[in-house]
Amino acid sequence: MSPDRTGRGSSSSSSSLKRLVCKSFVRAWGRRRPNLRRAVLLICTASAIYGIVIASQVLRGSTHPGKALRKAQQKVLTDASVRLAGTALEGNTFYMENAQPQGGSTSSSPVTLQPNVVYITLKTKRSKPANIRGTVRPKKRRKYGARRPGVVQDTESKKDTLWSKVPNSQHKSQAQSWIRGIDGHRGGRGTHQSNIRIYSDSAPPWFTKEDISAMRFLSDSRIGHIKQNLLLFESDQTPLMKMPVPPVGSGDCQGQCGVIKRPLDMSEVFAFHLDRVLGLNRTLPSVSRSLEFVQDGQPCPVILWDPSLLPTDNKTQSSIKLKWGTYQEMLRHKCWLNGKAPKADLGCTEIHHQEWCKMALFDFLLQVYTRLDR
Protein backbone atom coordinates (compact mmCIF):
# COMPACT_ATOMS: atom_id res chain seq x y z
CA MET A 1 0.00 0.00 0.00
CA SER A 2 1.34 3.43 -0.93
CA PRO A 3 1.88 6.20 1.65
CA ASP A 4 -0.82 8.38 0.02
CA ARG A 5 -3.50 5.72 0.43
CA THR A 6 -2.45 5.17 4.04
CA GLY A 7 -2.79 8.87 4.76
CA ARG A 8 -6.24 9.05 3.16
CA GLY A 9 -7.45 6.01 5.15
CA SER A 10 -6.27 7.43 8.43
CA SER A 11 -7.94 10.78 7.76
CA SER A 12 -11.29 9.13 6.83
CA SER A 13 -11.22 6.90 9.93
CA SER A 14 -10.53 9.89 12.20
CA SER A 15 -13.40 11.89 10.64
CA SER A 16 -15.84 8.97 11.05
CA LEU A 17 -14.71 8.57 14.65
CA LYS A 18 -15.39 12.24 15.32
CA ARG A 19 -18.87 11.95 13.83
CA LEU A 20 -19.67 8.91 15.97
CA VAL A 21 -18.54 10.70 19.12
CA CYS A 22 -20.60 13.78 18.28
CA LYS A 23 -23.77 11.71 17.64
CA SER A 24 -23.37 9.79 20.89
CA PHE A 25 -22.82 13.06 22.77
CA VAL A 26 -25.96 14.60 21.29
CA ARG A 27 -28.05 11.51 22.14
CA ALA A 28 -26.75 11.38 25.69
CA TRP A 29 -27.27 15.08 26.19
CA GLY A 30 -30.82 14.95 24.89
CA ARG A 31 -31.97 12.52 27.55
CA ARG A 32 -33.31 13.81 30.80
CA ARG A 33 -30.80 13.38 33.59
CA PRO A 34 -29.90 15.23 36.80
CA ASN A 35 -27.55 18.23 36.63
CA LEU A 36 -24.72 16.38 38.37
CA ARG A 37 -24.76 13.55 35.87
CA ARG A 38 -24.79 16.02 32.98
CA ALA A 39 -21.73 17.81 34.35
CA VAL A 40 -19.84 14.55 34.80
CA LEU A 41 -20.80 13.44 31.28
CA LEU A 42 -19.65 16.78 29.83
CA ILE A 43 -16.23 16.57 31.52
CA CYS A 44 -15.71 12.97 30.42
CA THR A 45 -16.66 13.78 26.84
CA ALA A 46 -14.25 16.76 26.70
CA SER A 47 -11.45 14.63 28.11
CA ALA A 48 -12.12 11.91 25.55
CA ILE A 49 -12.04 14.41 22.67
CA TYR A 50 -8.77 15.92 23.94
CA GLY A 51 -7.19 12.47 24.23
CA ILE A 52 -8.27 11.57 20.69
CA VAL A 53 -6.70 14.76 19.29
CA ILE A 54 -3.40 14.13 21.11
CA ALA A 55 -3.32 10.53 19.91
CA SER A 56 -3.87 11.60 16.29
CA GLN A 57 -0.98 14.12 16.51
CA VAL A 58 1.33 11.44 17.91
CA LEU A 59 0.37 9.06 15.11
CA ARG A 60 1.14 11.72 12.48
CA GLY A 61 4.56 12.44 14.02
CA SER A 62 5.48 8.75 14.11
CA THR A 63 4.52 8.19 10.46
CA HIS A 64 6.58 11.25 9.22
CA PRO A 65 9.49 11.87 11.70
CA GLY A 66 11.72 13.67 9.18
CA LYS A 67 9.12 16.31 8.39
CA ALA A 68 8.64 17.30 12.06
CA LEU A 69 12.41 17.48 12.65
CA ARG A 70 12.85 19.56 9.52
CA LYS A 71 10.24 22.05 10.70
CA ALA A 72 11.88 22.34 14.13
CA GLN A 73 15.32 22.94 12.58
CA GLN A 74 13.94 25.54 10.18
CA LYS A 75 12.39 27.37 13.12
CA VAL A 76 15.75 27.41 14.95
CA LEU A 77 17.55 28.75 11.87
CA THR A 78 14.90 31.43 11.39
CA ASP A 79 15.34 32.63 14.98
CA ALA A 80 19.13 32.68 14.57
CA SER A 81 18.94 34.67 11.33
CA VAL A 82 16.67 37.24 12.99
CA ARG A 83 19.12 37.67 15.89
CA LEU A 84 22.10 38.06 13.59
CA ALA A 85 20.39 40.55 11.26
CA GLY A 86 22.42 43.71 10.80
CA THR A 87 25.61 42.28 12.39
CA ALA A 88 27.18 40.88 9.26
CA LEU A 89 30.12 42.99 8.12
CA GLU A 90 32.00 43.08 4.86
CA GLY A 91 34.51 40.27 4.74
CA ASN A 92 32.93 38.21 7.52
CA THR A 93 33.08 34.41 7.19
CA PHE A 94 30.28 32.10 8.27
CA TYR A 95 30.87 28.40 9.12
CA MET A 96 28.05 25.84 9.48
CA GLU A 97 27.80 22.49 11.25
CA ASN A 98 25.13 19.80 10.79
CA ALA A 99 23.40 18.75 13.98
CA GLN A 100 22.36 15.17 14.63
CA PRO A 101 19.02 14.11 16.11
CA GLN A 102 18.69 13.81 19.86
CA GLY A 103 19.02 10.05 19.79
CA GLY A 104 22.61 10.32 18.57
CA SER A 105 21.94 8.15 15.49
CA THR A 106 22.14 9.52 12.01
CA SER A 107 19.00 9.28 9.90
CA SER A 108 19.21 7.10 6.79
CA SER A 109 16.76 9.26 4.85
CA PRO A 110 18.09 11.06 1.77
CA VAL A 111 17.01 14.42 3.27
CA THR A 112 20.08 16.43 4.42
CA LEU A 113 19.86 17.91 7.92
CA GLN A 114 19.85 21.71 8.09
CA PRO A 115 22.63 23.39 10.10
CA ASN A 116 21.68 24.81 13.47
CA VAL A 117 25.10 26.13 14.66
CA VAL A 118 26.55 29.35 13.22
CA TYR A 119 30.13 30.57 13.79
CA ILE A 120 31.05 34.18 13.02
CA THR A 121 34.65 35.38 12.52
CA LEU A 122 35.02 39.16 12.46
CA LYS A 123 37.81 40.81 10.51
CA THR A 124 40.51 42.28 12.75
CA LYS A 125 41.19 46.01 12.68
CA ARG A 126 44.38 47.39 11.22
CA SER A 127 46.99 48.08 13.89
CA LYS A 128 48.70 50.85 11.92
CA PRO A 129 46.89 53.78 10.30
CA ALA A 130 47.05 54.23 6.58
CA ASN A 131 49.53 56.69 5.16
CA ILE A 132 47.75 59.98 4.66
CA ARG A 133 48.95 61.87 1.66
CA GLY A 134 49.59 65.57 1.87
CA THR A 135 51.14 65.63 5.34
CA VAL A 136 54.18 67.83 5.80
CA ARG A 137 56.80 66.78 8.28
CA PRO A 138 58.90 69.52 9.86
CA LYS A 139 62.55 69.43 8.98
CA LYS A 140 65.02 68.98 11.78
CA ARG A 141 67.44 71.81 12.28
CA ARG A 142 71.04 70.81 12.46
CA LYS A 143 73.31 72.77 14.75
CA TYR A 144 76.93 73.00 13.79
CA GLY A 145 79.41 73.68 16.55
CA ALA A 146 81.88 76.41 15.70
CA ARG A 147 85.46 75.67 16.61
CA ARG A 148 87.84 78.56 17.03
CA PRO A 149 91.58 78.44 17.64
CA GLY A 150 92.43 78.82 21.29
CA VAL A 151 89.02 77.74 22.59
CA VAL A 152 90.19 74.22 23.42
CA GLN A 153 93.18 75.45 25.38
CA ASP A 154 91.09 78.04 27.24
CA THR A 155 88.51 75.38 28.02
CA GLU A 156 91.06 72.96 29.45
CA SER A 157 92.62 75.60 31.69
CA LYS A 158 89.25 76.74 33.08
CA LYS A 159 88.12 73.17 33.53
CA ASP A 160 91.05 72.48 35.89
CA THR A 161 90.30 75.66 37.86
CA LEU A 162 86.62 74.87 38.24
CA TRP A 163 87.23 71.21 38.97
CA SER A 164 89.28 72.05 42.05
CA LYS A 165 86.39 74.08 43.52
CA VAL A 166 83.79 71.33 43.23
CA PRO A 167 83.42 68.88 46.17
CA ASN A 168 84.86 65.42 45.66
CA SER A 169 81.42 63.83 46.04
CA GLN A 170 80.23 65.57 42.88
CA HIS A 171 83.21 64.71 40.65
CA LYS A 172 81.71 61.46 39.44
CA SER A 173 78.37 62.93 38.34
CA GLN A 174 79.94 66.02 36.77
CA ALA A 175 82.72 64.34 34.80
CA GLN A 176 81.14 64.89 31.37
CA SER A 177 79.42 68.21 32.04
CA TRP A 178 82.16 70.78 32.42
CA ILE A 179 83.36 70.69 28.83
CA ARG A 180 79.84 71.39 27.55
CA GLY A 181 78.86 73.78 30.31
CA ILE A 182 81.81 76.17 30.07
CA ASP A 183 81.26 77.29 26.51
CA GLY A 184 77.69 78.50 26.28
CA HIS A 185 77.99 79.82 22.72
CA ARG A 186 76.06 77.95 20.06
CA GLY A 187 76.14 78.66 16.42
CA GLY A 188 76.81 77.27 13.02
CA ARG A 189 79.73 77.64 10.68
CA GLY A 190 81.50 80.46 12.47
CA THR A 191 78.40 82.55 13.27
CA HIS A 192 77.03 83.07 16.77
CA GLN A 193 73.34 82.32 17.28
CA SER A 194 71.73 83.36 20.54
CA ASN A 195 69.39 81.12 22.48
CA ILE A 196 66.99 84.06 22.88
CA ARG A 197 65.41 84.30 19.45
CA ILE A 198 62.91 86.90 18.29
CA TYR A 199 61.15 85.89 15.09
CA SER A 200 59.17 89.10 14.60
CA ASP A 201 60.46 92.43 13.34
CA SER A 202 60.60 93.88 16.85
CA ALA A 203 60.76 92.58 20.39
CA PRO A 204 57.62 92.42 22.57
CA PRO A 205 56.73 95.93 23.76
CA TRP A 206 56.93 95.00 27.45
CA PHE A 207 60.66 94.18 27.16
CA THR A 208 63.26 96.93 27.09
CA LYS A 209 66.62 96.72 25.35
CA GLU A 210 68.29 96.18 28.72
CA ASP A 211 65.98 93.23 29.44
CA ILE A 212 66.78 91.54 26.14
CA SER A 213 70.51 92.14 26.60
CA ALA A 214 70.38 90.68 30.11
CA MET A 215 68.42 87.64 28.93
CA ARG A 216 70.93 86.96 26.15
CA PHE A 217 73.78 87.35 28.61
CA LEU A 218 72.23 84.85 31.02
CA SER A 219 71.52 82.27 28.31
CA ASP A 220 74.65 82.57 26.14
CA SER A 221 77.57 83.56 28.39
CA ARG A 222 80.30 81.14 29.35
CA ILE A 223 80.54 79.99 32.94
CA GLY A 224 83.79 81.36 34.33
CA HIS A 225 83.74 80.85 38.10
CA ILE A 226 81.67 79.17 40.79
CA LYS A 227 81.76 80.86 44.19
CA GLN A 228 80.46 79.88 47.62
CA ASN A 229 77.01 78.33 47.83
CA LEU A 230 75.79 80.58 45.04
CA LEU A 231 76.54 79.35 41.55
CA LEU A 232 77.77 82.47 39.78
CA PHE A 233 79.23 82.94 36.35
CA GLU A 234 81.02 86.05 35.17
CA SER A 235 81.13 87.51 31.71
CA ASP A 236 84.48 87.86 29.94
CA GLN A 237 82.92 90.21 27.39
CA THR A 238 82.01 93.86 27.43
CA PRO A 239 79.13 94.52 29.86
CA LEU A 240 75.84 94.75 27.98
CA MET A 241 74.22 97.02 30.53
CA LYS A 242 75.48 99.32 33.25
CA MET A 243 75.34 97.71 36.66
CA PRO A 244 75.97 99.35 40.04
CA VAL A 245 79.50 99.01 41.37
CA PRO A 246 79.71 96.18 43.92
CA PRO A 247 80.68 97.07 47.46
CA VAL A 248 84.34 96.78 48.33
CA GLY A 249 85.28 93.54 50.01
CA SER A 250 82.16 91.68 49.00
CA GLY A 251 84.08 89.19 46.87
CA ASP A 252 80.89 87.78 45.34
CA CYS A 253 80.97 89.14 41.82
CA GLN A 254 83.35 91.34 39.86
CA GLY A 255 81.50 92.59 36.80
CA GLN A 256 78.29 91.10 35.43
CA CYS A 257 77.21 87.82 37.03
CA GLY A 258 74.28 85.45 37.20
CA VAL A 259 72.79 83.37 39.99
CA ILE A 260 71.91 79.73 39.29
CA LYS A 261 69.12 78.48 41.54
CA ARG A 262 67.36 75.18 42.05
CA PRO A 263 65.05 73.69 39.38
CA LEU A 264 62.22 73.98 41.92
CA ASP A 265 62.49 77.79 41.74
CA MET A 266 61.39 77.91 38.11
CA SER A 267 58.47 80.13 39.11
CA GLU A 268 60.88 83.07 39.28
CA VAL A 269 61.25 82.96 35.49
CA PHE A 270 57.49 83.15 35.12
CA ALA A 271 57.43 85.97 37.68
CA PHE A 272 59.88 87.99 35.58
CA HIS A 273 57.74 87.71 32.45
CA LEU A 274 54.57 88.45 34.41
CA ASP A 275 56.23 91.50 35.96
CA ARG A 276 57.11 92.90 32.55
CA VAL A 277 53.68 92.20 31.05
CA LEU A 278 51.91 93.95 33.94
CA GLY A 279 54.32 96.88 33.71
CA LEU A 280 55.56 96.66 37.31
CA ASN A 281 59.29 96.40 36.43
CA ARG A 282 60.35 95.26 39.88
CA THR A 283 61.91 91.83 39.29
CA LEU A 284 65.37 90.96 38.02
CA PRO A 285 65.76 89.42 34.54
CA SER A 286 65.80 85.63 34.64
CA VAL A 287 65.88 82.81 32.10
CA SER A 288 65.74 79.03 32.14
CA ARG A 289 69.00 77.35 31.20
CA SER A 290 70.06 73.72 31.03
CA LEU A 291 73.27 72.96 32.91
CA GLU A 292 74.38 69.35 32.96
CA PHE A 293 76.42 69.70 36.15
CA VAL A 294 73.34 70.79 38.15
CA GLN A 295 70.55 68.33 39.04
CA ASP A 296 71.29 65.85 36.25
CA GLY A 297 70.87 68.36 33.45
CA GLN A 298 67.46 69.68 34.47
CA PRO A 299 66.79 73.32 33.44
CA CYS A 300 67.49 75.77 36.24
CA PRO A 301 66.44 79.41 36.66
CA VAL A 302 69.34 81.81 36.12
CA ILE A 303 68.81 85.29 37.59
CA LEU A 304 70.84 88.41 36.96
CA TRP A 305 72.98 89.29 39.98
CA ASP A 306 72.42 92.75 41.45
CA PRO A 307 75.27 93.65 43.85
CA SER A 308 73.28 96.54 45.30
CA LEU A 309 70.91 94.13 47.01
CA LEU A 310 71.91 92.98 50.47
CA PRO A 311 71.94 89.16 50.69
CA THR A 312 70.28 87.98 53.89
CA ASP A 313 71.72 84.51 53.38
CA ASN A 314 73.66 82.60 50.76
CA LYS A 315 70.58 81.32 48.94
CA THR A 316 68.31 84.26 48.17
CA GLN A 317 68.50 87.95 47.35
CA SER A 318 66.38 90.44 49.29
CA SER A 319 66.66 94.08 50.23
CA ILE A 320 65.83 93.93 53.94
CA LYS A 321 65.42 91.43 56.72
CA LEU A 322 61.72 91.34 57.41
CA LYS A 323 59.41 89.46 59.75
CA TRP A 324 55.65 89.18 59.84
CA GLY A 325 55.17 91.64 62.70
CA THR A 326 57.37 94.30 61.08
CA TYR A 327 55.52 93.82 57.81
CA GLN A 328 52.16 94.42 59.51
CA GLU A 329 53.44 97.58 61.21
CA MET A 330 54.72 99.07 57.95
CA LEU A 331 51.38 98.39 56.29
CA ARG A 332 49.61 100.08 59.18
CA HIS A 333 51.82 103.19 59.06
CA LYS A 334 51.58 103.49 55.23
CA CYS A 335 55.19 104.53 54.85
CA TRP A 336 55.97 106.99 52.04
CA LEU A 337 52.36 107.09 50.86
CA ASN A 338 51.81 109.93 48.34
CA GLY A 339 55.45 111.02 48.83
CA LYS A 340 54.94 111.94 52.48
CA ALA A 341 58.03 111.29 54.61
CA PRO A 342 57.30 109.09 57.64
CA LYS A 343 58.36 109.86 61.18
CA ALA A 344 61.65 108.51 62.43
CA ASP A 345 60.12 106.58 65.33
CA LEU A 346 57.80 104.55 63.09
CA GLY A 347 60.61 102.29 61.89
CA CYS A 348 59.79 102.65 58.18
CA THR A 349 62.22 101.52 55.52
CA GLU A 350 62.91 103.01 52.11
CA ILE A 351 60.25 100.80 50.53
CA HIS A 352 57.14 102.71 49.50
CA HIS A 353 53.70 101.56 50.51
CA GLN A 354 52.70 100.85 46.89
CA GLU A 355 55.52 98.29 46.54
CA TRP A 356 53.93 96.06 49.16
CA CYS A 357 50.74 95.98 47.09
CA LYS A 358 52.71 94.85 44.04
CA MET A 359 54.43 92.14 46.06
CA ALA A 360 51.06 90.95 47.37
CA LEU A 361 49.79 90.81 43.78
CA PHE A 362 52.77 88.68 42.78
CA ASP A 363 52.26 86.34 45.71
CA PHE A 364 48.61 85.91 44.77
CA LEU A 365 49.30 85.22 41.09
CA LEU A 366 52.22 82.89 41.75
CA GLN A 367 50.59 81.20 44.76
CA VAL A 368 53.49 82.04 47.09
CA TYR A 369 52.50 81.77 50.75
CA THR A 370 55.89 81.43 52.48
CA ARG A 371 57.70 84.59 51.44
CA LEU A 372 57.88 85.99 55.00
CA ASP A 373 58.45 82.57 56.59
CA ARG A 374 61.96 82.07 55.26
Curated annotation (Swiss-Prot):
Residues 62-374 are extracellular. Residues 166-177 have a biased composition (Polar residues). Keywords: Glycoprotein, Golgi apparatus, Membrane, Signal-anchor, Transmembrane, Transmembrane helix. It is found in: Golgi apparatus membrane. Glycans are attached at N281, N314. Residues 136-177 are annotated as: Disordered. InterPro entries: FAM198. Residues 136-146 have a biased composition (Basic residues). GO terms for cellular component: Golgi apparatus; Golgi membrane. Residues 1-38 are cytoplasmic. The chain crosses the membrane at residues 39-61. It is a single-pass type II membrane protein. Its main location: Golgi. Pfam families: FAM198 (PF15051). Belongs to the GASK family. This is Golgi-associated kinase 1B.
